[in-house]
Every structure is written in structure tokens, then in C-alpha cells.
Regions:
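Low-complexity, intrinsically disordered segments enriched in Ser/Thr together with acidic residues
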Residues: 68-107
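Extracellular, repeat-based ectodomains that mediate carbohydrate processing or recognition
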Residues: 60-64, 75-84, 112-631
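Short acidic/polar inter-strand loop motif in beta-rich domains
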Residues: 109-111, 568-572, 971-978
Length: 989
């Protein structure tokens, strides 16, 4: 039960209370109950963690406590011990005073409380600790459509009003489904290429406690990404957005657009950027003269830069490049003070790790770049705001050293993408001195996400962010490297109100909970009143993906309005599915989840003045020399400089992978945001291409598919970096999980058909339909973890639709053959033991499969799919896959294996005895290099050098027989390279 759309909390004197019941329960327990208000009335009840038959009727609820819902082992916590978690309701109550009494009757006992007992950040208990009560901000739903409203931005007007911009995505009604299943094989695949309704930018006004109607800023049918808004000195709101100006062209071009909206009426539309590189992520602020500034991320000459432009009347001046380093720059943030200063902050990979820099313009003249946080640790995602005193506050994420470097089942000297984040806050005085609040925000923010809301601890107690090399060395059989038990607080949003009170919102998965569309992340708010930070305040209806940034705006001292989108994923009961024969994928015809906008209001009173601050250490810059892996950089240069000469033209080695997961996957709770996967690929991984391969692009939901497709185009930088359109299609053994890849945008994910039984020696109808679908859209697929419960017994293959296999993945093991290095075994198989799935058995059946390696979940920097391609265009990369011109490796190892004019992956006939010429260039010494023919070792050498080159001839071929030959190289570091087989038919002379 929700508040009426647009119903202003202030107009009703509303208070919201989170009532959690069954704290500490060890078995599922009934907590049916009723709420009564003396001196007021109940306005609404929201469910907390409902599932099954849990329900609400008026002021009465019927529910139990339940075992926590988690998916697989990729959740950032464990269910060891008691896994029964509290359930509850969120009550919104209208009262005339804080003396109102609330009485609650439950099946486990009765209790009561006075509203005045509850203050923000100070929970109370009842029934000997089995009941938890805390006051939370009232959340008002401000959109309620069947479409998706997302990416809100907000700005205060001159008269206390608030303007909100956002994007609305319009569904194709035929595809607004959640994992819809197929009853029979499709005969026509055209519906899986049908268009969406696209995006449209809207604006709304909030004034005098009332939300106005949506105001269209653009037409519908766009391909748009993120908004920003600012109000100029004349009181006119300016709305900014990024839009693919070439949509639906094959080559995207996102540009920054703006429209002034005087009095809420659309004015002239302006294109601010104009460059072949994509321009995205606008942020805006208004300077002391009333001019609006906008900053954004734009791709120039193959690298992402930070740019800015300034309003001049009803136009904007030319774009200026703010960042100067020749590395990728990310996440611009902007703020202006009342003395003519405008500051833009961002994070940069200039020092071979992420650091934060800022640059300030005074009266329009840019000063030098200044480091904000530049240690050897990961520092990213700044959010900035000025105090009235001219002090600039910066909040940002801090992670461990070695972010995005080697992490997987066999090696953990680095830190994976989402292995821990702490939020830091520091201030910069006008004279450059660095200060900090007198108490640590880490003593208020959530710690390591726990399944129990009261057990997570605090950030300050979970800050062992740096790598643990012993992690992989001490892993248990059948399990991967352990998730590091750190705080995971992300995407800080900071603002300062006119009294000087600092407001900080952060994203957390605490308490951990899984829904049918994935892990639940929510927003927590803390505030610094000049003396100390409040305890965390939960924001209702903030449940959504990890990368979900609310808009914070204050129009009165001590008060805050938070506008955010929620896809309602905390409501497990909305998406509960019927039992399905489709392996891990439940099925439901309609999609009950969609994004709406909500507004939360909170009043904590004015801050103490002046704010108490303490001196902080000056910023130290570690620099690239202290961070860079010179061996890695040299190996990358050698690979990129290398050319393979063939009769069909020169080929380059194009490094990448197409099996990375993110928040979009239903089991992506340990993987991090999807944009962080691109950050990893572009920077820490230094890849040339990537496929962000989430499960069905998010449970087969149209909206997350649309976002995934959009980002695949946003990060496309022709000639420099090539994202491919990719997803994982998971069907349990014996049919198998497969990663799908296309060179074209717009192909939707294919639903499932019923799975075949393991003891049935038949072709799988679902897999056969997948092959037909791939051929219809010129795509390919690759099975992964083939000798596990996610694998296949190789009952199916199509040489055109499935030309390669993921022979190795960093998150788990090698599936080449039994007893090969890093292969799984009956005693140690991460993801169950299914020996019929070894790749050697597929090759023995005559299947022609090239070899590639990719990461899967969590793992970084140790799985590479190296394509031998004419160039880096999407079409050339797909062509290399289809020709099996590919090799897999766990490090940046160069491999060139030929037979006469033929290269790895080729199938051909010869009258000569088959011969191989092998050239390997490693990152360390090769301890062994072997040649394998028809699943037998036929040659082995132990070179003890990093450079290997030799020729080998098969002196005993069988005339008329086709044999496959491939090379495996093993380094003394344990790293491996697999050159794809060649299939050679010996015809004899």
C-alpha cells in the first residue's frame, strides 16, 4: 500500500516508521499483527521483505520471518549460522503532534510506542529486542506509469521551488516480460529484433508541497542517457541530457543537448557538444553571476576527457577540455560558490590507478589541476559541494591497491572490481588547506553487508581493502577465491545546505537480500551537523541497481529533498515464479518490476556554526612509477605491435573477453556496477574489446536489456575500444550455459524451452532453437564451464553458430581435459563435477571449436580472449570468431601458431606431413610447451625462457584422416596459453 502519487508529506504532517519483527528468530515464525494510532491515523503500510503468502489488508498484516533469499555464491556475504531474517512493514502515519501513541498487536506479543520517542538515526527496541523501530523519511511516489522513469536530477529555483528532470523509457508491450518461456520452437525470430518505444526526457516542478504534471522536454523515441538540471540567474531551468544523435545508425554518436524551460515551457533546444566521440554524463551548476555551467565526459582521440561549457544568454559557449592527462577521465562532478568559483572534479587513470583531481575556474578562467586523492589505492566517484564559507567538500569512494588486477581461483595478488569500498570525505579551504570533519563518517556508515540488518557493523571496522595474496592459496576444494569481507559503500552523493549541514547519501547492499531480478541495493543517508555525523537513515523506495544515484537538493536550512528511482526489487513477492523445468531460470509472463520516481523529505534542523573541522594530511601523489606493472605494460605493447601476415591480409591480435557480469545479473551481487566493468576493460584490463555478458541482460527484462545495449554503444570508440553486444544464456547441464555475442544492436535475448533429461541421448530443442536464432541474426555462442553443473555433455554443436568454447575462466578452472594444468577434478570442481563436459570430448566427437578464456563472475586480469582480426570493428571481431582465429590465455602472452599459410583455427587438407611453427612470447619463463594431437601429447619441451620458437612435424599421420593439433604453453608463474586447434586432413602424396 503506497502513498498517493504526488501526495506531499508536509501537507499531512506525516511520519514514517520502519517496524521490523522477528529480530533474532532462528526458525520461521508468524508475526501477524495489527497497528492502531491514537491521536492520528495510518496513511499507508509498505511491506519490508514479503514473499509467499505474506500480505497486508488495511492496518493488518499477515507474514512470517523467512530464510534469507540469496543467489549462488556470488553474494557478498555468507548464510553460515542463522539465516532467518526479520520481516516487517513501513508505516506512514498522519498525526497532529509527536504525542500520538501507536499500539501494535502481534502473534508474538503486543507493544507500543510514542512517535516522539523515535528520532532519525536512533532506533529503539521492543519485546526484548525482537522488534526494531526506527524513524525514516516519508517517501512519496511521484510517477506511476507502466513505463520506466529513471536518472533523476534536481535543482532549486529562486523562489524555493524544485525542478526535477528525468528520462522515461517506453516499453514495447510485446516484450515487457520477466523471463517469459517458450512452449515450442520459434519459426520466426523477427519479433526478437522489434524496436522499443525509446526514451523521452521530462521535467516536473515541486512547489508549495505539490508536484506538478510531467512536462515533456523532448520528443519520444530517443536513445538518451542521464540528465542534469540547473536554474540560471533569471530563474529559468536548463535541462541537459546525452542523446545518440545517430540512433539507430550502426555507429553511435552521443552528444550533449540542452533546453531552457522558462516557466516550464520548452524553449530552444541546443546541441552543446559536436564531435565524433561519444559525450555523456552531463552535470550542471550555476555560478555567482547566474550563468549555468555544464561538464561532461567526452571521448576525444580514443580517450575519455572531461569537458565543460558555459551559458551565454540563451546559448552555450564552445566546449573546453578541462582534464589534461592523456588517460581516461571519469565521473565529472561540478559545484559553484558565491564568490565566482566553479569547480569540476573527476577521477582519472593517469597514474595507472584511479585518482581524483579537480580544477577550479575563477571568473571564467581555469586554474591548474589539483589532486584530491591520489594514493596507490583506488579513489573514484567524487561528489562535491561548496559551503557558504567557500570551503569545498568532496566525498568519494576508496578501494584497495591493485584494483582490477589479478584476482581469481588460482591467484589473488590484486583486488577484483567490487571487493570493498569505503566512503571518504575531505574539505578544501579557499587557501588550499585540507580539512576533515572531527568525527569519521565511517563510524556511521554501514559495514560489511550482512543478511541481518543489525549485524553488519560499521564501515570503520571493515576497511582491509588491499589485496590478500593468500586468499587463492588457501581456498577450499570446490570453492573459488573468497569474497573479501569489506564495507561496500558506493556512489556518494553530497550536498551542503545553507546552514552548513553536510548531507551524504551512499549506496549499500546491507542488509543482503536477493530478489527475482537480482541483489537489492538501497540508499542510506547520514548528515554532519557541525559536531558529528548522524547514524545511517534508511531511505524507503530506494531499492534498485547498485549504480543508482539519487538527486539531493535543499531549499531550506536543515532540510533535504531526495529524489530517486526504485524498481521495487525489495518486493520478492511481486516476482515469485512458478516452478520451471528451465534450470536456474524461473519464469513469469509479465514483468512486475519497473522504475518509478520517489521523493523523500527530511528535516534535521540547522547545523552548528561554525562547522567543527580538523586539519587533514596534505594530498600526496603516488604517481604512475609507484603503481605501474612494467612487465605487463611491455607485454601489452608487444602484443599490440605484432602483426600476423596471412594470404588474406595482415591480422592484429585484439585482446578482450565476453564473459563479465555486473549488478544487472540476478547473481551479480559480488560483481559491481556495469559501468565499472567497462572501467575495468578500458583501464585496469587495457582490453581492446569486451562483451559485458549479464544473464539475459537482466532476467530478460526489456529495460535492463535496453540499458545494456545503450552502454555497449556509449563505450564504443572506433579504432580504440570495441564493446560487443553480448549476454549469457544459462541452461543447466546437460545443455549448458552459453555466452552469446552479436555485432549489431537491437537483438533481444531468447527465452527458454523445457530442458532435456541427462539420460536422454537426444538433441536439445532449446539449443537447436538457439542456433537458429544466432544464424538469423549472424551471432555466435560459446559454452563455458563445460565440465560442471553449468556445462554440457556436448549433445549439440553447430559449427557456424558455436565455433568457439570458453576453455578457461578466471573465476573457476580449466575445462580442456582431465589432469591438465588448473583443470577441475572430482576432488576439486568449482560448480559441480560433470566429466562428460571436457572440451577434449567435444573435439573427439569431431566438433571444431576455437579456444578462448574469459572471466565470468568477480575475476579480473587473468582471462583473455585474443582474436586475430583485420581491424577492431565489430564486424571484423565477429568474423575472427566465426573463423576460430582466436586463442585463450591467463596473462598477456603472445601466441602465433601456423602450418604453412594457415593459422590457428583453420581446417585444411595437405599432401605434406602436417607441421606446426610455434612462436610464444611470455610474461615469464615457459616451464613447458606441449603439442597435442587428437587428445594425445605428441611433443613436449621445457624451454626455461620467456621467448619460445620451434617447428614440429607429424611423422606418423594417417592418410585420409583429419586430426586436430593444438599447442599449450605453461609459464613458471602458473599462467597458461591455449592456441586454438588446426584441423588437418592428410591426403598423402
Amino acid at each position: 500500500v503506497l502513498l498517493a502519487v504526488g501526495l506531499p508529506a508536509a501537507a499531512q504532517n506525516l511520519t514514517s516508521v520502519r517496524i521490523l519483527l522477528g529480530v533474532g528468530d532462528t526458525t520461521p515464525t508468524r508475526w501477524d499483527g495489527t497497528l492502531q494510532v491514537a491521536g492520528g491515523s495510518m496513511v499507508s503500510l509498505d511491506p519490508w521483505r514479503f514473499e509467499g503468502s505474506d500480505g497486508i489488508s488495511g492496518a493488518t498484516w499477515h507474514f512470517s520471518t523467512h530464510p534469507v533469499r540469496l543467489f549462488s555464491g556470488t553474494s557478498p556475504t555468507s548464510t553460515a549460522g542463522n539465516n532467518i531474517v526479520a520481516n516487517g512493514v513501513i508505516a506512514t502515519i498522519s498525526t497532529a503532534s509527536s504525542d500520538a501513541e501507536i499500539k501494535i498487536t502481534t502473534a508474538q506479543g503486543d507493544f507500543g510506542f510514542r512517535l516522539g520517542e523515535l528520532t532519525y538515526g536512533k532506533p529503539v527496541s521492543r519485546l526484548e529486542g525482537k522488534v526494531h523501530l526506527d524513524r525514516i523519511p516519508v517517501s512519496t511516489q511521484i510517477t506511476n506509469t507502466k513505463e520506466e522513469e529513471d536518472f533523476p536530477a534536481a535543482a532549486a529555483g529562486k523562489n524555493g521551488e524544485v525542478w526535477v528532470a528525468y528520462i522515461q523509457f517506453h516499453h514495447n508491450p510485446e516484450h515487457n516480460a520477466l523471463r517469459a518461456a517458450l512452449d515450442s520452437p520459434p519459426k520466426d525470430f523477427s519479433k526478437w529484433k522489434s524496436p522499443t518505444g525509446g526514451d523521452q526526457v521530462f521535467m516536473r516542478k515541486y512547489a508549495n508541497g505539490t508536484w506538478g504534471d510531467p512536462i515533456p522536454v523532448t520528443e519520444s523515441g530517443l536513445d538518451a542517457f542521464k540528465t542534469s538540471i540547473a536554474v540560471d540567474g533569471q530563474g529559468r531551468p536548463w535541462v541537459f541530457w546525452s542523446q545518440n544523435a545517430r540512433f539507430p545508425s550502426r555507429i553511435p554518436n552521443f552528444e550533449i543537448f540542452a533546453r531552457v524551460m522558462p516557466g516550464g515551457q520548452p524553449g530552444k533546444r541546443i546541441q552543446i557538444s559536436n564531435d565524433p566521440g561519444n559525450d555523456v554524463a552531463p552535470v550542471a551548476a550555476t555560478d555567482s553571476k547566474g550563468n549555468v555551467w555544464v561538464a561532461w565526459q567526452g571521448w576525444r582521440n580514443g580517450k575519455a576527457a572531461i569537458l565543460a561549457a558555459t551559458q551565454s544568454g540563451s546559448e552555450f559557449g564552445p566546449a573546453q577540455i578541462v582534464s589534461k592527462a592523456p588517460a581516461n577521465q571519469w565521473n565529472p562532478a561540478i559545484a559553484a560558490d558565491q564568490k565566482g568559483r566553479v569547480t569540476v572534479a573527476w577521477d582519472t587513470y593517469r597514474n595507472e590507478n584511479y585518482d581524483i583531481y579537480m580544477r577550479t575556474a575563477v571568473d571564467g578562467n581555469w586554474g591548474p589541476e589539483t589532486p584530491v586523492a591520489a594514493t596507490a589505492r583506488y579513489e573514484a566517484y567524487p561528489s562535491i559541494a561548496y559551503e557558504n564559507t567557500g570551503r569545498l567538500w568532496v566525498a568519494y569512494e576508496e578501494g584497495g591497491k591493485g584494483w582490477g588486477k589479478d584476482f581469481g581461483a588460482y591467484n589473488t595478488p590484486g583486488v577484483a572490481v567490487y571487493q570493498g569500498r569505503a566512503i571518504r570525505v575531505r574539505g578544501f579551504e579557499p587557501d588550499g588547506r585540507v580539512v576533515q570533519t572531527v568525527t569519521d563518517p565511517g563510524a556511521s556508515l554501514p559495514g560489511f553487508p550482512s543478511i541481518h540488518f543489525d549485524k553488519g557493523g560499521l564501515q570503520k571496522d571493515f576497511e582491509k581493502l588491499d589485496p590478500d595474496p593468500e586468499n587463492a592459496k588457501t581456498r577450499k576444494p570446490d570453492t573459488g577465491a573468497r569474497n573479501m569481507q569489506n564495507a561496500r559503500n558506493n556512489f556518494p552523493r553530497l550536498t551542503v545546505d545553507s546552514s552548513g549541514r553536510i548531507w551524504l547519501a551512499v549506496r549499500s547492499a546491507h542488509p543482503v537480500f536477493w530478489s527475482p531480478i537480482g541483489t537489492v541495493w538501497t540508499e542510506f543517508l547520514i548528515s554532519y551537523d557541525g559536531k558529528g555525523w548522524t547514524n545511517p537513515i534508511f531511505l524507503n523506495h530506494s531499492d534498485n541497481l547498485l549504480d543508482n544515484k539519487p538527486a539531493l537538493v535543499s531549499t531550506q536550512p536543515g532540510q533535504l529533498l531526495v529524489v530517486n528511482s526504485s524498481d521495487k526489487r525489495r518486493r520478492y513477492d511481486l516476482g515469485e515464479a512458478i516452478n520451471s523445468p528451465l534450470g536456474i531460470m524461473p519464469t513469469r509472463k509479465e514483468d512486475p518490476y519497473e522504475n518509478d520516481l520517489y521523493a523523500s523529505t527530511i528535516d534535521l534542523g540547522v547545523a552548528s556554526q561554525p562547522l567543527a573541522v580538523a586539519d587533514a594530511p596534505p594530498v600526496q601523489v603516488a604517481g604512475a612509477e609507484a603503481v605501474a606493472d612494467k612487465t605487463d605494460l611491455a607485454a601489452l605493447k608487444k602484443i599490440r605491435d605484432y602483426t600476423i601476415n596471412t594470404s588474406a591480409g595482415d591480422l592484429k591480435i585484439v585482446r578482450g573477453e565476453f564473459h563479465r557480469h555486473s549488478e544487472i545479473s540476478m547473481d551479480g551481487g559480488g560483481d559491481g556496477s556495469i559501468i565499472d566493468q567497462y572501467r575495468y576493460a578500458l583501464d585496469a584490463g587495457s582490453l581492446d574489446w569486451v562483451g559485458c555478458c549479464d544473464h539475459d541482460n537482466g532476467a530478460g527484462r526489456e529495460y535492463t536489456w535496453w540499458l545494456s545495449q545503450k552502454l555497449t554503444d556509449i563505450f564504443y570508440s572506433p579504432g580504440t575500444f570495441t564493446p560487443m553486444f553480448s549476454y549469457e544464456r544459462s541452461v543447466n547441464y546437460p545443455e549448458g550455459h552459453r555466452n552469446v555475442i552479436f555485432a549489431q544492436r537491437g537483438v533481444r535475448t531468447l527465452p527458454r524451452q523445457p530442458i532435456t533429461e541427462e539420460n536422454q541421448n537426444v538433441h536439445a530443442p532449446d539449443t537447436q532453437s538457439l542456433y537458429a536464432y544466432l544464424k538469423a541474426f549472424n551471432g555466435i555462442a560459446a559454452a563455458h564451464t563445460s565440465a560442471t553443473g553449468m556445462g554440457t555433455d556436448w549433445r549439440d554443436n553447430d559449427p557456424l553458430a558455436e565455433p568457439v568454447v570458453e576453455i578457461y575462466q578466471g573465476d573457476r578452472q580449466n575445462y580442456e581435459m582431465p589432469d591438465a594444468p588448473r583443470s577441475n577434478s572430482e576432488k576439486d570442481s568449482i560448480g559441480l563435477w560433470r566429466p562428460k563436459g571436457f572440451v577434449s570430448l567435444a573435439l573427439a566427437k569431431g566438433y571444431k571449436l576455437g579456444f578462448q578464456a574469459s572471466s565470468d563472475h568477480i575475476s579480473t586480469h587473468m582471462s583473455y580472449c585474443n582474436l586475430l582480426a583485420k581491424d577492431t570493428s565489430r564486424e571484423s571481431l565477429l568474423d575472427a570468431f566465426q573463423k576460430r582465429h582466436v586463442y585463450g590465455a591467463t596473462d598477456n602472452i603472445l601466441a602465433d601458431v601456423r602450418s604453412g599459410p594457415h593459422i590457428m583455427g583453420d581446417a585444411f587438407a595437405t599432401a605434406e606431413q602436417p607441421n606446426l611453427h610455434v612462436k610464444l612470447s611470455g610474461t615469464s619463463k615457459f616451464s613447458k610447451v606441449v603439442v597435442i594431437k587428437d587428445n594425445n601429447y605428441v611433443y613436449s619441451t621445457e624451454p626455461g625462457t620467456s621467448q619460445v620458437e620451434f617447428s614440429w612435424r607429424d611423422n606418423s599421420p594417417t592418410k585420409g584422416k583429419t586430426s586436430y593439433y593444438y599447442v599449450r604453453g605453461e609459464q613458471d608463474t602458473g599462467d597458461i596459453v591455449w592456441a586454438s586447434p588446426m584441423w588437418i586432413t592428410y591426403t598423402g602424396k
